[in-house]
């Protein structure tokens, strides 16, 4: 996009009524006039995007390829605009050239633009006041926006992750899974359902049998019922899948795997409770859950079970086994072989070997009474029941012991739907701060999940954005060799923020890393157009000085005004083409609905809005500020500072 803009600026500067014999010389002079500004504007776009490489974690992996691609393209563009473009112009731009005044489009644009710029100069306080007011309004709009780590990506599928009680049996969880799959298939938008309970056949999956994972593949949107959204489908499925003893959870397959790998949390947000005793941790986690209930945006609220697992305790009676001439190992061996099985031998089938195990049948070990009747063989007293030498009972314990940093851990899990992540967690933190004083000594809380990523990315962006502005200012200073001219171009950045803030507010987009990257790209585009305007305004000042000299006695305020208007109106068409090319490239993305458009739209929205407002500011306000600066110079120093634009 910037490459086409650079060629347009260079080409439009040759559209003058010139004799054929001086064509090459005029082309050379025209290219030299804008080459420095065009080159440095391209460099500014490159350098302003460099801080994106400072992003780390998931956001870094997502946006680094974009930054690399844009950087390499713009480096090639910066080289071509000062080497190849002049050569191509000399090859293809031949014959008779018409003046810009003969172009009907240009005449219409100038007839519209000149009264506007004269009105802005006449009502300068009103013009500046309106711009400052618009900028002031954009600040509370930005502050009122929600916050999230990354825009939610529609994967085209759902992951249903319900959990049951920790003591659920294999047969019961299988029945629940079948019932759930049957209910899910009744929704018209569902194409396929694939569910599993427990862990996969891998050593890295520690999912208990009480955890169910069901992948729901959805049909194409064209086959959905009219007006249905993904949120509506989730709500409908959730209402139909209300099964006693089962807590529902909804997410998407890819983001779920990313969350579990990066944070160890399978939901959007996890509140980790650390301590020394599992019962105390679980009791406090239940209190946290009760406080979180009713908060807008908190969905699928659930306390990870760390108690409630069922165990069979076999406590050997040492006095009794001594009476029967048995040892503890003898009793344990009987229990192990009866319940877990004992390896008897190994069978060889070809190159494969299989162990042969034996254990009691299901009917002899599926209840406490049957276990008590297990026969234990003695040397002198024959077979005796197991209950004669051991106490057998059911007890409760942790179904899984989770620890982190050598401390026991419990977790309160929930997803965020229907509200932004930042404000949801902020409200939850305010509500839970009152409970912090009631935490027992040695216990503490830690927020995890996507909120952990949000905090990290916000800290990085607070460092990146000031660096972007400093880099842009330094690049413009080296381009103009004047801090005043650099500041005049840089002032377009906050006014570009106006359009970006307005459009993301009315579009209903939350602030995220994607929006921040869009603003970073916008700042480079805004300054790029401002540099061209400053070049032509300084060119007009050169013409004024060449004609009337550079002193208070020869230059009047009226002269300054007329030459500024002439410089602003000069090459109006390529300036507007810059805006149009940017909009034509970006606007189609706003109406895209394919996979990935959820991430692209937050990047593009601030760029579209910012290009519109920055273009308005550059065309109407930049000449006004430039004129006021020159009037101040003439009044204070008796002459004006003229920037050399021909190199």
Named regions from a protein language model:
Residues 20, 171-265, 290, 319-341, ...:
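Solvent-exposed, membrane-proximal periplasmic/extracellular interface segments of envelope transport
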Residues 2-29, 58, 64, 83-135, ...:
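Interfacial helix-loop-helix hairpins and adjacent transmembrane helices
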Residues 16, 20, 249-251, 282-468, ...:
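Extracytoplasmic/periplasmic membrane-proximal domains and adjacent transmembrane bundles
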């Amino acid at each position: 996009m910037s490459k086409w803009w650079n060629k347009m600026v260079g080409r439009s500067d040759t559209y003058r009524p010139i004799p054929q014999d001086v064509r090459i010389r005029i082309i050379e002079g025209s290219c030299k006039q804008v080459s420095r500004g065009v080159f440095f504007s391209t460099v500014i776009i490159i350098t302003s995007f460099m801080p994106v490489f400072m992003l780390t974690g998931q956001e870094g992996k997502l946006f680094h390829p974009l930054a690399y691609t844009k950087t390499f393209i713009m480096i090639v563009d910066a080289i071509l605009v000062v080497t190849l473009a002049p050569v191509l112009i000399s090859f293809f731009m031949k014959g008779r050239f018409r003046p810009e005044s003969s172009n009907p489009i240009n005449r219409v644009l100038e007839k519209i633009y000149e009264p506007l710029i004269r009105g802005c100069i006449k009502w300068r306080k009103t013009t500046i006041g309106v711009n400052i007011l618009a900028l002031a309004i954009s600040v509370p709009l930005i502050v009122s926006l929600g916050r999230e780590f990354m825009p939610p990506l529609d994967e085209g599928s759902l992951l249903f992750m319900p959990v049951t009680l920790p003591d659920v049996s294999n047969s019961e969880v299988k029945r629940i899974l079948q019932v759930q799959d049957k209910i899910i298939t009744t929704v018209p938008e569902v194409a396929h359902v694939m569910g599993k309970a427990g862990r996969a056949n891998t050593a890295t999956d520690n999912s208990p049998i009480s955890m169910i994972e069901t992948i729901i593949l959805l049909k194409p949107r064209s086959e959905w019922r009219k007006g249905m959204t993904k949120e509506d489908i989730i709500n409908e499925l959730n209402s139909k899948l209300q099964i006693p003893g089962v807590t529902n959870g909804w997410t998407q397959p890819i983001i779920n795997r990313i969350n579990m790998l990066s944070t160890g949390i399978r939901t959007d947000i996890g509140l980790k409770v650390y301590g020394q005793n599992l019962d105390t941790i679980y009791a406090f986690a239940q209190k946290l859950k009760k406080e979180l209930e009713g908060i807008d945006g908190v969905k699928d609220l659930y306390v990870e079970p760390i108690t409630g697992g069922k165990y069979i305790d076999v406590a050997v009676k040492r006095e009794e086994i001594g009476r029967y001439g048995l040892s503890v190992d003898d009793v344990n061996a009987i229990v192990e072989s009866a319940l877990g099985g004992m390896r008897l031998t190994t069978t060889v089938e070809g190159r494969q070997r299989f162990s042969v195990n034996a254990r009691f049948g299901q009917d002899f070990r599926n209840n406490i009474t049957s276990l008590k009747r297990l026969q234990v063989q003695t040397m002198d007293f024959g077979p005796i029941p197991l209950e004669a030498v051991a106490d057998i009972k059911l007890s409760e314990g942790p179904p899984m012991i989770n620890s982190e940093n050598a401390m026991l851990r419990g977790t309160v899990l929930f997803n965020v739907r229907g509200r932004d992540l930042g404000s949801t967690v902020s409200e939850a933190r305010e509500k839970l701060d009152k409970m912090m004083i009631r935490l027992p000594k040695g216990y503490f809380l830690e927020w995890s999940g996507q909120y952990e990523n949000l905090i990290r990315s916000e800290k990085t962006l607070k460092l990146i954005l000031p660096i972007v502005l400093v880099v842009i200012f330094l690049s413009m200073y080296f381009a103009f060799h004047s801090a005043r001219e650099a500041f005049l171009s840089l002032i377009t950045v906050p006014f570009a923020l106006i359009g970006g803030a307005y459009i993301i507010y009315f579009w209903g987009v939350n602030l995220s890393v994607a929006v921040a990257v869009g603003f970073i790209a916008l700042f480079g585009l805004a300054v790029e157009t401002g540099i061209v305007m400053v070049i032509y305004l300084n060119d007009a000042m050169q013409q004024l000085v060449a004609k009337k000299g550079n002193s208070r006695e020869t230059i009047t305020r009226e002269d300054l005004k007329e030459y500024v208007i002439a410089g602003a109106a000069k090459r109006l068409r390529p300036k507007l083409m810059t805006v149009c090319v940017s909009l034509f490239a970006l606007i189609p993305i706003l109406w895209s609905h394919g996979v990935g458009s959820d991430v692209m739209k937050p990047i593009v929205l601030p760029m579209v809005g910012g290009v519109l407002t920055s273009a308005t500011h550059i065309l109407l306000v930049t000449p006004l500020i430039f004129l006021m600066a020159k009037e101040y110079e003439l009044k204070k120093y008796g002459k004006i500072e003229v920037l050399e634009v021909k190199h």
